[in-house]
Each structure stands twice: as structure tokens, then as C-alpha cells.
Swiss-Prot record:
Name the record gives this protein: ATP-dependent DNA helicase CHL1
High-level lineage: Eukaryota, Fungi, Dikarya, Ascomycota, Saccharomycotina
This protein's encoding gene: CHL1
Annotated SMART domains: DEXDc2, HELICc2
This protein's record includes keyword Transferase: no
Record GO biological process: establishment of sister chromatid cohesion; interstrand cross-link repair; mitotic G1 DNA damage checkpoint signaling; mitotic sister chromatid cohesion
Organism: Saccharomyces cerevisiae (strain ATCC 204508 / S288c)
Sequence positions bearing Phosphoserine: S86, S172
Entry's cofactor comment: Binds 1 [4Fe-4S] cluster.
Annotated Helicase ATP-binding domain residues: 6-458
Annotated localization: Nucleus
């Protein structure tokens, strides 16, 4: 199949919509032309994920096919070097040798695909038997060094004993030594081993099948060298549930082999990367409740004398039959994250480390944002983006995510609680701690007291910038001490021991008092432990850059915030072949260009904003021109606006929309919604509206109302959901079909300009404009647009909840006269802009609404 046919079909499993073809062609063209960035907006419900898969996998397989063809051509034209043959050999001998080498590598590729097919037809219970058979065929030569050890390890004591809370002896001045050896019984750390193990870059597929990589005679895997894919597709998203949706979509299409008839059946080598919290199978580690504690407990166990029964940091473990069997089982079919845990348990092999070992073979890798966006995490996991395709989905949150990864915040209350926790821990275990641990805990406590005193003495207003050197003025704390304390926290794993000990005390006290910990407290248990927050904050203190700023935030907090997200993103851009930023609501795209890609030439950036797959008659967007409906900061509390105009609009709309269809309205803040509800309740308007439609409203600390609203809609009683922009219901929840036949945006949801974060960001942006030669007017314009972009991104994200598939229908109501202004209107998503109705007065809007739903009712008969 030639390139034209590839680009026309993309092996989509269904007949694609026009916008899906448009998106696939754009992605394929970007990759073929070597463009660096693609920013793609495709509304939710338009098959965006499947289109991205089809386009990128088609290009990937075509690219590998081109490499294979060039390799065959090089053999025919004698362009390769047959270093194992003498220059005096006849040409026909050299040619025959080259062909035989190529054929040998192709045979190995074919053998591996057949091997994966064998696994795919074998149940998990038969897997060990199959491994033994494979050994007879010479695929696995090593003896499983762990089997005997695992047999006697079925019953593990996972209860928390006092010994679990005590760190290993720590030498206070050992920072100049190899800490992995001095504190871990001579074992080498994973990071040190990994960095030396896979340091060479893989450029083309020919490098992998040319036979030049020396083979370890103790390596029992005959496929280890031949199946490493130099160009990969890395797909990152915000949550594991979103990554799971990608997995289900990847199962739908089928792609041809890169090697044509030479290797007729080439499976998609898919690898889902996840954290130890998702993949760990050791009960001694999983008894801890937070990700940070699990990571530290894992490291503690692996480097202990006892070790982990499911993993060893040795070549022997990497090439033992069960480890290789788990790796191959991962690639035998498209496995989800949840599939890896039972597979690992059935073989007694750690799925987390086995999946890391499988990375070189993978074609497609899914990973959470943190794994991709944090350079240190990529390094520790040996994620090499060189010449690969990086897809970042749900990218409307990308800038905020980068900022949060490289930022840190600690409050006065956090510091006091951490101080109290250390004192409690120290008083309990001081007689059982060696001098190194005691000294460092006292130093850490002294540092906390210094920070507490600094906040109490210096906090004056939110947004007040802080010189980090001022935090320790007049104290005996200096940067060197902080570096040593950070080393201590990292090596000793003291953070999870202190935090979990104090949590155990709370649970024990609660049990004695027969007063179970409230649900809200249980939720906090899984949040980040305090001492980890402290260590992150200290890390920011010791790694100062000009791109960040310390300042005071609300609740007597000190925050470090990254101000230039483009800096850490540069490393991804520099390594990857192409970065695709995709999402359902990517407007305004100017935000990405100015904040994330300022140094990328415009000719290297491709943008696409797709329309929706629904027929045009299935969506209407209304913007009122009534001056009374203006929710500015000065006017929004007006009794006339709230009790008359806003209330009457909801009453009229509730009557115009059929009762079987729900209405979802988004308010700019919890405070404003609470004000509206209070006003309506004071004069019985709330009861009046509630008689027309059952009202459900979101409260900041309230219970989940979605299930009640959904049940009410299902019963056809007429329901109205009042939600918050940026709240629990504005993102990630699909209000499809009758759950939302009308979505209302009340006002323009500008962020709080008095928050410390926005004060510092706006000041930084204005200073940057002035520094580059701009005027005060230009700086003012830039900060104004910055605020507008935040606002309109939130609008697009909220109204995008309404339409979820091709047959869905709904109306959008933008309830503020300011939406008529070009600067706001042009920042709406394209599919929303294209659906704007010319009706402007509320009377006209309601009349048009009745006609809209009347037509839907007639068409459904």
C-alpha cells in the first residue's frame, strides 16, 4: 500500500466523519512534513482519541516500513558495511552474507510475533507451563532464581508494628559517600544502575536489527535485541481513567505489518505505565496509604536485607522466565493497567518493574502527566523521547499542570502540624534512633520553627513577594543545612514513617473513643503527607531559578510558583519528533503560543479547530443583548438583577425546555451561587422555581448531588442543576442526552484578581513586556488578555459538557451582554461560534427555544 492510500484510510474501524478525516489528515501531514507542534481542538464526542490513534499508528507503521525498504535497498546497492567479511571476498559472497543477516533478523521478528500469538491463546493459568516449554525450545536459558524464595512467601504479615516506623541507622555526615551503599547494605540504587544500563540512543530500526549489539551470554531472552522500537508514540493524559479510555479505543483498529509479507502479523506493542500505587503487588508495601509512602516503603524494602520477593535489581531477575513471560504477556494483546496486576500476581513478578523493562520494545506507551512533564521522573524511568511522537490529551490543562508540578506551597498550619508530628514521633522513638537520625530530626524541627516564626513575623498581605534568603535571616539555618536535610529525608525515608505513625495514632485514638474518623478525614489520608509537602518546599528553596517566585498566599501560606512553563517544556520539544496538543476545548489557542511555545517558529506550528459531528440544527447558542443581564463585579449583587431578571429567565427557560430534559447552569463562584440561592430563598422565589423544576445546587463542602440529579432526570420530573465553573461538575462529567438539553453560563467567570497567584503572575507578565521594550499600555493590554483567556477557557470547558455524541442535541445560553463583544466572542470554541443564533432579547430566546424543542419532538415521532 502506498503512502496516498495510507493517508486516505488510516485504518479507521468505522466510516469516519468528515472532521475525523480532517483531523487524521492534519496529524499525518504534520508528522510527514516534520512539523514540531500540532494544536488540535476536536469537541468531546467526535472520536478524537480514535482519530489520533489511527493517524499516528498509520504513520508509525509506514515509517518503519520505509526504514525496512531502505535497509533492503542498501543491501542491494552494497551501502552497508559487512565488517565480519574480508574486503577480498567476492561480491556474491558479500551479497549473500548481507541477505542472510537480514533474513535472520526478520526470522527473529517473525518468531517473536508467533510467540506472542501462542501466549495470546494460552490462559494465565497455563502461563508457567508455557514458560517451561519455551525453555526447552531455547528461548529461555536461565533458571528462575526467585521461585524457591517465592514458594515460602505466601502468607505475609502486613500489620503495622512499631518497627515499621523506625528508620535504619543514618550517619549524619555520609553525604559525600555513596548513600545507596552506606545506608542500604551495599546495594546499588535502581537509578544508578538504570542510567548506566541504557544510555545509548536508538536512532533507527536498522540499529536494532543489524545485530551489532553485543549479547550477554547470561541473557536468556533471544528476542531482547531484535524488538526495540526507536520511534514510539507516547500518549499522556490527566487521569488513569482517561488512559483506560485510550486503551479501549486502541483495541478497535487493526494496522498492517511494517514488514509486509516478511512478518505478516505484527501486533501493536502497547505498554501502559502507571505508578506503584496502581501496580505494586507486595502487601508489605501496599499497606501504606499514600503514593509517597508507597514509593518510600518500596525503596526501603528493596534495599533491605530481606528484599522484595517480587523484584530484584539484577540481570538474573530481568531475564528469568517469569519476568520475560510477564513482559511478553503484556505485548500478546492490548492490556489495560488493571490487567497487569493479576498477571504479575499469577507469576509472582512485580508488574511495575516488569513494565519498565518492557519499555524498549513498546510502540505505544500511555503515561500520566507527571511521568511525561517532570524531567526528573522521565530520567528515573528511562523514558527517552528522542525522535518520538508525544500526544498530550486534555491539553487545555497543560499549562496549569506544568506550573503545579514545578510549584510548591506550605501553610502556617501545615508547618505547625508537621512540627507537632515530629515532636510526637521523636518523644516516642528517640531511645531507638541512632545519633544520625536524632540529630537530623532536631535540625528539621529547628528549620520548621524558623519558617513558622518567619510567617508570623512577616506576613502582611496576599501576593507579597518574598526573597528566599530573608526566610533564614538571623537564624543558624543556611542552604547547606537544607541540602543535607533533604538528603536525609530522601535516604532515610523518614517522611512516610513519621506521617504514617501519626496517622496510626489518630486511628487508634478514634477506635478507643468509638468515634470513627469522619469520611472527610479519611479522604485526607490519601492526600499528600505533610512532611512530603515540606520536603518539596525545601527542594524549591534549594533550586532557585529566575522563572519562579516565592510569595505569601492566603491562609498564611508561602508559595513558590513557576512563572515560565515554557522552560521545563523545552526539554520535551527538543527531544520529540513532534508534540501533539489535543483537547475538546483548546480555545483560546493564543495562550499556548505565548505561554508554552514562545520560541517555536510559527511555521513549525499547525493548528486545527474542528467543528462538531452533530448536524447544525442540533445546537443553538444564544447571547442576550439585554443590558440588565450584565454580571460585572459592581452589578452582579444587585437585587434587581438576581431577583427579577436572572430569576425570571430561569423560570421561563424551565418551562420552555421539556421536563424530560435537564438544565445545567454554571455560576462563576461558590460565593455568588450561595448569594443567589440565599436571595431567592428569602422571598420564596426558590420555592417557586423548585415547583417548576427540582433544583439541585453545588455547595463547596456539600454532598455529591450528581446522582440525585441524574435520578430526577431519569424520572422525567424536570430538573435544574446549578453548578460552579471549575467545580466538581464542570469537567470530566458527561452530561449527554437528557442529562443536559440546555446549558446556561451565568456571567463571565473571571478568576479572583486578588489571589496571590494572579497578583504575582500579572506583575511578572507586565514586567516582562516592559523589559522587552513594551509600553505600559501594551503591558496593561497583555495582562487584560491573560485574564480573558483564563475566563474563556473556563467557559469553553463548561459548555462543552452538553454535546457528547453525533445524535445529541442541546442549547447553550451565554447569559451576559459582554459575550457580544468581539474579544470574548472570538475566544469561544469554533463549534460554539458557528452555532450562535441571532435572537437577542430574552423573550426572543425563549420563543426560539420552544420552537427548537418542538422540532425535536416532531422528529422523534
Amino acid at each position: 500500500m502506498d503512502k496516498k492510500e495510507y493517508s486516505e484510510t488510516f485504518y479507521h474501524p468505522y466510516k469516519p466523519y468528515d472532521i475525523q478525516v480532517q483531523l487524521m489528515e492534519t496529524v499525518y501531514r504534520v508528522l510527514s512534513e516534520g512539523k514540531k507542534i500540532a494544536i488540535l481542538e476536536s469537541p468531546t464526542g467526535t472520536g478524537k482519541t480514535l482519530s489520533l490513534i489511527c493517524a499516528t499508528m498509520t504513520w508509525l507503521r509506514m515509517n518503519k516500513a520505509d526504514i525496512f525498504t531502505r535497509m533492503e535497498t542498501n543491501i542491494k546497492t552494497n551501502e552497508d558495511d559487512s565488517e565480519n567479511l574480508s574486503d577480498d571476498e567476492p561480491d556474491w559472497v558479500i551479497d549473500t552474507y548481507r541477505k542472510s543477516v537480514l533474513q535472520e533478523k526478520v526470522d527473529l521478528l517473525n518468531d517473536y510475533e508467533k510467540h506472542l500469538n501462542e501466549i495470546n491463546t494460552t490462559s494465565c493459568k497455563q502461563l508457567k507451563t508455557m514458560c517451561d516449554l519455551d525453555k526447552e525450545h531455547g528461548r529461555y536459558k536461565s533458571v528462575d532464581p526467585l521461585r524457591k524464595k517465592r514458594k515460602g512467601a505466601r502468607h505475609l504479615d502486613v500489620s503495622l508494628e512499631e518497627q515499621d516506623f523506625i528508620p535504619r541507622p543514618y550517619e549524619s555526615d555520609s553525604e559525600n559517600n555513596d548513600t545507596s551503599k552506606s545506608t542500604r547494605g551495599g546495594r546499588i540504587s535502581d537509578k544508578d544502575y538504570k542510567l548506566s544500563e541504557l544510555n545509548s540512543q536508538i536512532i533507527t530500526l536498522l540499529d536494532k536489527i543489524d545485530g551489532k549489539v553485543s549479547r550477554d551470554p547470561n541473557n536468556g531472552d533471544r528476542f531482547d535485541v531484535t524488538n526495540q522500537n526507536p520511534v514510539k508514540i507516547y500518549y499522556a493524559s490527566r487521569t488513569y481513567s482517561q488512559l483506560g479510555q485510550f486503551t479501549s479505543q486502541l483495541r478497535l483498529p487493526s494496522f498492517p505489518s511494517s514488514f509486509r509479507d516478511k512478518v505478516p502479523d505484527e501486533k501493536v506493542k502497547y505498554l501502559p505505565l502507571a505508578s506503584k500505587k496502581q501496580l505494586c503487588i507486595n502487601p508489605k508495601v501496599m499497606k501504606w496509604k499514600t503514593l509517597e509512602a508507597i514509593n518510600d516503603a518500596c525503596a526501603d524494602l528493596r534495599h533491605s536485607k530481606e528484599g522484595c520477593i517480587f523484584y530484584q535489581n539484577t540481570n538474573e531477575w530481568r531475564h528469568c522466565p517469569d519476568t520475560l513471560a510477564l513482559r511478553d504477556m503484556i505485548f500478546s494483546e492490548i492490556q489495560d493497567i488493571e490487567d497487569l496486576v493479576p498477571l504479575g500476581k499469577s507469576l509472582g513478578i512485580c508488574p511495575y518493574y516488569a513494565s519498565r523493562e518492557a519499555l524498549p520494545i513498546a510502540e505505544v506507551v500511555t503515561l500520566p502527566y507527571q511521568y511525561l512533564l517532570s524531567e526528573s521522573t522521565r530520567s528515573s524511568l528511562q523514558i527517552n523521547l528522542e525522535n518520538s511522537i508525544v500526544i498530550i490529551d486534555e491539553a487545555h490543562n497543560l499549562i496549569e499542570t506544568i506550573n503545579s508540578i514545578y510549584s510548591s506551597q506550605i501553610s502556617l498550619e501545615d508547618l505547625k502540624n508537621c512540627h507537632k508530628g515530629i515532636v510526637t514521633y521523636f518523644n516516642k522513638f528517640k531511645s531507638r534512633l541512632n545519633p544520625g537520625n536524632r540529630v537530623n530530626l532536631l535540625k528539621l524541627n529547628s528549620l520548621l520553627m524558623t519558617l513558622i516564626q518567619f510567617i508570623v513575623k512577616n506576613f502582611k498581605k496576599i501576593g507579597q513577594e518574598i526573597d528566599p534568603n530573608d526566610m533564614f535571616t538571623g537564624s543558624n539555618i543556611d542552604t547547606l543545612n537544607i541540602h543535607k536535610l533533604l538528603r536525609y529525608i530522601k535516604v532515610s525515608k523518614i517522611a512516610y514513617k513519621i506521617d504514617t505513625y501519626n496517622q496510626a495514632l489518630k486511628e487508634e485514638e478514634s477506635s478507643k473513643n468509638e468515634n470513627p474518623i469522619k469520611e472527610t478525614h479519611k479522604k485526607s489520608v490519601s492526600s499528600q503527607p505533610l512532611l512530603f509537602k515540606v520536603s518539596q518546599f525545601l527542594y524549591c528553596l534549594t533550586n532557585l531559578t529566575s522563572e519562579g517566585q516565592f510569595f505569601f498566599e492566603k491562609n498564611y501560606s508561602i508559595k513558590y510558583m513557576l512563572l515560565e512553563p515554557s522552560k521545563p517544556f523545552e526539554s520535551i520539544l527538543n527531544q520529540a519528533k513532534c508534540v501533539v496538543l489535543a483537547g475538546g476545548t483548546m480555545e483560546p489557542m493564543s495562550e499556548f503560543l505565548s505561554n508554552l511555545l514562545p520560541e517555536v517558529p510559527s511555521e513549525d506550528i499547525t493548528t486545527l479547530s474542528c467543528n462538531h459531528v452533530i448536524p447544525k440544527e442540533n445546537l443553538q447558542t444564544y447571547i442576550t443583548n439585554q443590558p440588565e443581564l450584565e454580571f460585572t463585579f459592581e452589578k452582579r449583587m444587585s437585587p434587581s438583577l438576581v431577583n427579577n431578571h436572572l430569576f425570571q429567565f430561569f423560570v421561563d427557560l424551565s418551562k420552555a425546555v421539556p421536563k424530560k430534559g435537564g438544565i445545567v447552569a454554571f455560576f462563576p463562584s461558590y460565593q455568588y451561587l450561595a448569594h443567589v440561592i440565599q436571595c431567592w430563598k428569602q422571598n420564596d422565589r426558590f420555592a417557586t422555581l423548585n415547583n417548576v423544576r427540582k433544583i439541585f445546587y453545588e455547595a463547596k463542602d456539600g454532598d455529591d448531588i450528581l446522582s440525585g440529579y441524574s435520578d430526577s432526570v431519569a424520572e422525567g420530573r424536570g430538573s435544574l442543576l446549578l453548578a460552579i465553573v471549575g467545580g466538581k461538575l464542570s469537567e470530566g462529567i458527561n452530561f449527554q442526552d437528557d442529562l443536559c438539553r440546555a446549558v446556561v453560563m451565568v456571567g463571565l467567570p473571571f478568576p479572583n484578581i486578588f489571589s496571590g497567584e494572579l497578583i504575582v503572575k500579572r506583575k511578572h507578565l507586565a514586567a516582562k513586556i516592559m523589559k522587552s521594550g513594551g509600553t505600559e499600555e501594551e503591558a496593561s493590554r497583555a495582562t487584560k488578555e491573560f485574564m480573558e483567556n483564563i475566563c474563556m477557557k473556563a467557559v469553553n470547558q463548561s459548555v462543552g459538557r452538553a454535546i457528547r455524541h453525533a445524535n445529541d442535541y442541546a442549547n447553550i445560553y451565554l447569559l451576559d451582554v459582554r459575550y457580544n463583544r468581539p474579544n470574548f466572542r472570538k475566544k469561544l470554541s469554533r463549534w460554539v461560534q458557528d452555532s450562535i443564533n441571532s435572537e437577542h432579547t430574552t423573550h426572543q430566546v425563549i420563543s426560539s427555544t420552544r420552537k427548537f424543542f418542538s422540532m425535536r419532538s416532531l422528529n422523534s415521532r
